[in-house]
Structures are given as structure tokens and as C-alpha cells.
Amino acid sequence: MNKKIIITALLALVSLGANAQLESVKELSMKSEYFSHERQVLIYTPVGYKQFDQTYYDVIYVFDAQDRTMFDLVHCLLNIACKPDPDGGRGMSFIIVGICSPTLWDINYFRNNDYLPMPLHGNKGLFKEGYYYGNSPDLKKFVKNELMPYVAKNYRTSGRTLGIGHSLSASFVLDCMITDDLFDDYIAVSPNCSYDEYRLATDIEGYQFKSRKTPRFIYASMAREIEKEPEYWGDEWKAGWERVSTILKDKSHFNENTVTSVHTFPEYEHYRSFMPSVTAALNDYIMFGAKNLVGYIGEEISPVHIELRGKNLPNDIYITGNQEALGNWEAEGVKMNLVSDSIAAIDLRLHLPAQFKFTRGSWEREAVIENADTGNHIIHDAEHTTRIYRLWERNPWLGE
């Protein structure tokens, strides 16, 4: 089965590539009730987004996107530096949202304002009088109450989210996990874990990671700050990181479906570690999805209606997928009803997320779908349970 899924994915990419919509980036200015200034946002949609109208995409939120390099690196690395799911079930396409931190001299608002809270332990270090801090709760509210609803309303999203940050924005991303559970998954590159008398490290040490029952991915990394540049970054930086990384490495703190990954890149300095670290993180994340999300079945059950459309359909069309009602990935899973010579349909009650594919009774004769991205077809939530898939007219079935 695995080999056939890979062949299908490759065939779909080749056959659809000539007609697929190019990837695009939209620049957006958003008013916010939490800020006196507009927030600048970048939204990337992958190749084929408009064509693949039956695909709902996970969303990656990238902070510090005012440094356009960081935002662009994420979608570029996914396309050229990440290994695909070896079983072909997990797609490689994401919607990516870049959140820019401003430099506003007229109101003395800067990047650190976005990523630091008000101090609990006095005005020292990053919290000295005249420094910039205190608005991280407002940024969380903006993301949760304004940006995420905007993205969900205007784009086809799965509901699953990943937050990525570097340095102070990495600290912010980790803080979002322990204070707001803002994202499902987290990538933190060279986080500052020592500010405000190790506030973040202390909070992570006290956080009940096992309270989350659904799959989760947590990645954190450090560059040469603690091994080769301690005189610049200080003993506190090293101590904070060691406390956080110790927790993340200890699997006893987590449920089995939580995957943690901790890396160090001592050959790279603080800023330049972003590329190798995010490359490693995204590869780990794809594998996490392949192993932990493809096999995950939630408790929610919903009625679904699924159609497969094409010309002169045969009467031996099957749907198969990740649960008993879908045949548990047996090639000859559940036979669909031939409504007409152009429509096969089926109504089921499925656990969500439901993942499935179409065959003619064997993996050598798997359907090639024109209006969905590669990987398994997925129904993520009860709001989008009617799906209509179209066979590729030129070559609708593998092996025919």
C-alpha cells in the first residue's frame, strides 16, 4: 500500500502541476481593538489552493515576519528542504500567516512590546525603565480573537495550527502554550527563557502537559549562545535554557501522543541558526503528522456525505480510510453507491477527523483526484462534512 500511495502522490503532482495556481502572498493591514496602530500581516497560500477546493489546510503562524526572510524561509523550506511523509498520507501544503512586529518611533512601540509581558519581579534587565515591554497579552488577544477568526472565515482551514518564533518571539510562542493554549503545535528557535527571573522556565516547569489529550508537537532549539558565546548571552540565558530543555526532553511529563524535539546548533550564531533549526523542526513536524495525526481518531462523531464525480463511472468504486466505518484502509473498503454514470456517493457516520481515499478495489487502481491536494482526503470538523471530489479526466484511475 505505501508504495502505491507514493506513486499516486507523484502522479497527482505531475499531472496537475501545469494547471495549478501558483503560490501567492497577500499583504494585509488589520485594525485591532487591542492596538492603536494597524497590524501588518502576510498570508501565504500554496500551489493549487484555488484548484484544490476540497482540501482544508493546517495553518502555520510565523512571528517576527517583519523580517521577511523568516516568513519566506518557512514556505520555501517546506517546498525544497522537507522530506515527505514516506507513506504518502500527510500532505506538505500549508497556509502560512506572518505576523509583523512594528517599529513605531512616534508612539515608542517596538518589537519587544509585542513579545514581553509586564514584569513580576521589578524593573530590571529587559524591563528597565525606558525599555519596551508589556503588550504580549494584547498580541495574544489579537491573534486569538481577530486574526485567527479572519483566517478561518476567508480561507479553507483545518482548524489545526502551528506557531513559530525566534528569540523573544520564540519565548512568546512558548508562553502562548502555557498560558493560553493558543496553538496546537509549537516551534521555538533560541528562546529567551531567563527574563523576569526565569519566569518562562518556571512556568514551563509547573505546566501540566498531560492535560492535553490530543496529539501535540513541541520543538525547541538553541544555537551557539550557551556553548561558544556565554560571555555575551550570560549565565542566566544558559540556566533558563537548561531548565526548559530538561523538561522537554523528559518524556514522563507528556502523553504518548505528544512529540517533543530538542536540538542544538552550536556551529551557528543566534540569528543564522533560524534556517537550519526550522529545517530540522519542519522535517520533525512532517514526521509527527505522518505518525501521530494520520492515525489519530477523535471521539466526535458526525454524519458525512461524500461524492466522487467523473465520466462513465464503474460500479466498483470503494472508499477506504482510518476507521472501521471506512474499512480500516483495506483497499476494498466500503462500496459507494452509483447514483448515476457520473456520481458515486455514500452517507456515513464517522469519527472526526476522518481520513480516506478512493479505489476500484485495489491500491493498483487508486483514484486520481483533480480538486484535492495530495495525501489522504480529510474531514476535520462537523462544519465541512459534505465533500464532492472530481476524478482527473485525463487519467482517473491509477493503472488504467
What are these regions (language model features)?
Residues 21-299, 320, 324-325, 339-344, ...:
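Non-catalytic cap/lid and distal C-terminal segments of serine-dependent acyl enzymes
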Residues 22, 303, 333:
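Beta-strand-rich binding-surface signature
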Residues 115-116, 348-352, 391-395:
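Secondary-structure transition/turn motif
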Residues 302-310:
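A short, amphipathic beta-strand motif
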